[in-house]
Amino acid sequence: SPEVVKDLVSYGADFARNDDGSLAYTREGAHSHNRIIFHEDVTGKEITSTLLAQVKKLSNVTLMEYTTMVDIIERDNKCYGAIIRKQDGTLEKVTAAYTVMACGGVGGLYRFSTNFRHLTGDSLAIAKKHGIELKNPDYVQIHPTTFYTKKHEDRSFLISESVRGEGAKLLDKNMNRFVDELLPRDVLTGKIREQMKKDGTDFVWEDLRTIPRDELVSHFPNIIEHCKEMGYDVFKEPIPVVPAQHYFMGGVKVNHHSRTSMECLYAVGETACNGVHGRNRLASNSLLESLVFAKRAAGQMAELGFVNDEIAAKKATDSIDLADYSDEKAVEREYRKLAMEAIEGRISVGTEETVESGIAYIQA
């Protein structure tokens, strides 16, 4: 992982620094020490935008934006590429020596989630369809603090765990502190739910005024701005927060090189389950894990060589009728059903109320 961080810095990733120029570290829930490098309150965005800028410089890479993977091309448990749908709705078959699935998680299946709504577990559906092994599909994590809103259709806005790592306090309806804010996510989520039930409220309060103003402004500008847009001034008052689905620790089973049970098919990021997070991921570990295991996948593919069996690939592609995928809505319904079957409406790291709301939404 130190090499990955060095790579990012060399690409221009702008991580926070101390006065002496060394990397600054913050702390989040269940971490024993300050060990997390960061960029304001949008570290993930900084990493992805930096990597994307580097990719755009590569002459041997073709970026196809607004393009959706509809299915993989496979024959005899070997992947030969993917079927894609372009922005204008046209379908194409793309062959490849190796295919990597990086489809995100399952948050779009839940009523309350920090994920984008289009992340509905398509990789799980494709895996089930083609007999690719899955692992721990019930390992779904709840984040303790997202901004409370009555608009259920919106993506829940994350109030970063590092806010609590820097000193923010959680308060009940009477503005009394009721919990250790740096408990592991599952434990803290349970405590918040218990307090909400006790108070008869839909949220608890988070007070950021315990953080020095300069630190708030430099570290959490996006949170400050979002709260302002929602009518709250974090410098003068607490904000309402509530737990929501956040991260999928299960997924397509992969080995330590991110290879799936299907030959020439890899999976990375939230799509994959390599087991390193166990049942309850530590905050921010997923960013580094995604990069480390993606780099391992790339390294193995380069080592094995990019040689495609054109005859076998042709047989695989010829067996596919694109007309089977012409009804986009029908494909979406099929994949949502398969993804739902994969996770079975389960959610292991949360509370009874969250489980019931998740299952109710999935079954709707």
Question: Residues of each region from the PLM?
Answer:
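A glycine-rich dinucleotide-binding beta-alpha-beta segment and adjacent secondary-structure elements
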Residues: 64-65, 70-79, 83-85, 219-272, ...
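General beta-strand structural signal in soluble alpha/beta enzymes
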Residues: 15-18, 63-65, 101-102, 134-139, ...
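Glycine- and aromatic-enriched mobile tails/lids
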Residues: 7, 16-27, 31-34, 164, ...
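Conserved redox-cofactor binding core of oxidoreductases
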Residues: 9-90, 102, 146-150, 170
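Core beta-strand elements of the Rossmann-like FAD/NAD(P) dinucleotide-binding domain
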Residues: 88-98, 260-264
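An anion/pyrophosphate-binding glycine-rich loop and adjacent beta-alpha core
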Residues: 126, 132-237, 300-306
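Conserved FAD-binding subdomain of flavin-dependent enzymes
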Residues: 1-15, 129-140
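Glycine-rich loop(s) and the adjacent beta-strand/alpha-helix scaffold that form part
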Residues: 98-151, 157, 287, 291
